[in-house]
């Protein structure tokens, strides 16, 4: 990108903005490359895909989906009220299928292995204490679709809501 911009400038065409990047490459931007801006899309939140790529650690993921257990049909299965409309169906960038589940469960042993539009199916140990009404957190595989539809973000610190942030651009893709 920088070489192409240099060649373009060399033939007399001015370039004021040189913009490139992605979340996995953001850490390599040192400010001296010639880029005037970078565009790391999920950098502000990170997600399960960035953890799988090694871009971030799980403790760097700043957004999770709060979902409620709505059914416990068998000892080794639970149903939550977050499905593909909330979590998305991504399992990796550009069909890479890096991830086998549809999100990362926080503080719960098990996997989120299937989604319908409105529900997620958890496979859990038969002796799991999860019960109907329990709230759990799921880090989405790809945070973009999850955050695009949200009307509010709840800022938590140590499990306590510290701030409610209204999202003015919720669903604003046209």
Model feature map: region roles:
Residues 35-37, 66, 77, 119:
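A residue-level signal for beta-strand positions that form part of recognition/binding surfaces
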Residues 1-57:
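Active-site loop/helix belt of alpha/beta enzymes
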Residues 74-174:
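C-terminal accessory subdomain/extension
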Residues 59-66:
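Short coil-to-beta-strand transition motifs
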Residues 29, 38-40, 50-51, 60, ...:
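Non-transmembrane, interaction-prone segments in cytosolic or luminal domains
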Residues 3, 23, 50-54, 63, ...:
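Sparse, context-dependent recognition of short Cys/His-centered cofactor- or disulfide-binding micro-motifs
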């Amino acid at each position: 990108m920088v070489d192409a911009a240099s060649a373009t400038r060399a033939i007399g065409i001015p370039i004021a903005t040189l913009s490139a990047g992605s979340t996995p490459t953001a850490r390599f931007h040192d400010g001296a490359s010639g880029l005037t801006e970078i565009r790391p899309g999920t950098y502000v939140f990170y997600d399960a895909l960035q953890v799988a790529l090694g871009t971030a650690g799980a403790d760097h993921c700043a957004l999770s989906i709060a979902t409620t257990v709505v059914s416990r049909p068998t000892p080794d299965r639970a149903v939550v009220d977050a499905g593909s409309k909330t979590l998305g169906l991504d399992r990796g960038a550009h069909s890479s299928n890096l991830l086998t589940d549809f999100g990362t469960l926080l503080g719960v042993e098990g996997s989120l292995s299937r989604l319908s539009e409105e529900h997620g199916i958890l496979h859990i140990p038969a002796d799991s204490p999860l019960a109907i009404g329990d709230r759990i957190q799921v880090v989405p595989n790809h945070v973009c679709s999850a955050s695009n539809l949200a009307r509010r973000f709840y800022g938590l610190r140590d499990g306590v809501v510290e701030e409610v942030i209204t999202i003015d651009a919720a669903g604003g893709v046209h």
